[in-house]
A protein has these predicted regions:
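Residue(s) in the substrate-gating loop at a strand-loop-helix junction
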Residues: 146
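Short, small/polar-rich loop/turn modules that mediate ligand/substrate recognition or access, typified
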Residues: 178-183, 237-240
Length: 253
């Protein structure tokens, strides 16, 4: 599917992977709606890129529905969704303060998994109403997992579970939506330079980068966005999880 003049919704669009994806899509000629919970940041990013933005908690049914509706009303349809929104919470199953809090586990699952699926199902319904191209393709949905889905570390029970579920969702979703001409793919990034890393010291960042076989550095959001572009443009990519990690395999801790 060509990107030019196509319509995309990007969650987590205010910063990091989502912001880089939105920027690439706009530069490629797409009509883009950024969605984020941070109203000020997403509005500023949209103004910078010259696209649209909407504020929404993607785990909320009504809010996500409103975001998809706003996109369709603004641009006249929908061709793609890139789910980049997510949170990280580190907590041991049995820590110094006792068992893992159920509330924090639920929060991570709610944002990362429920939020992604919420937008996926709503976007799929909107994309299914879009006119198919000559090959019968209507659109593509790209979710974001993590290498933690496969190499979850100690303290990542909630995060790894949420991302593992997204990885597992990929194939059944792709199979089910194939009859509508909708592809579903997932990217599982390694360690990237995002706001989630901002609180780490230079020493910690260097240590993490040294663990990547090649290139021995943190990934750049633009590299994630470049893979998004390739997935959109290569119609044979469907139902697969692609690790984007420089051959990184996370240690237990």
């Amino acid at each position: 599917m060509q990107i030019d003049n196509k319509i995309f919704l990007v969650s987590g669009g205010a910063s990091g992977l989502g912001a880089a994806t939105g920027e690439l899509l706009v530069k490629a000629g797409a009509k883009v709606m950024l969605v984020d919970l941070n109203a000020e940041a997403v509005a500023a990013q949209a103004q910078k890129l010259g696209c649209r933005s909407v504020v929404a908690d993607i785990s909320n049914e009504a809010a996500a529905e409103a975001a998809v509706k706003a996109t369709v009303e603004a641009f006249g349809g929908l061709n793609g969704l890139v789910n980049c929104a997510g949170i990280v919470r580190g907590e041991k199953i049995l820590g110094k303060n006792g068992p893992h809090a159920l509330a924090s586990f639920s929060q991570v699952i709610n944002v990362n998994l429920i939020g992604s699926f919420n937008l996926l199902r709503l976007a799929a319904a909107a994309i299914a109403e879009t006119e198919a191209d000559a090959d019968g393709e209507r659109g593509v949905i790209i979710n974001t997992a993590s290498v933690a889905a496969f190499d979850g570390q100690i303290g990542q029970a909630a995060y790894a579970a949420s991302k593992g579920a997204i990885a597992s969702l990929t194939l059944p979703a792709a199979r089910e939506l194939a009859r509508f001409g909708i592809r579903v793919m997932t990217i599982a990034p390694g360690i990237f330079e995002t706001p989630m890393m901002a609180g780490m010291t230079p020493e910690v960042r260097e240590s993490l980068a040294a663990g990547v076989p090649f290139p021995p550095r943190l990934g750049k959001p633009a590299e994630y966005a470049a893979l998004v572009r390739h997935i959109i443009e290569n119609s044979m990519l469907n139902g697969e999880v692609i690790r984007l990690d420089g051959a990184l395999r996370m240690a237990a801790k």
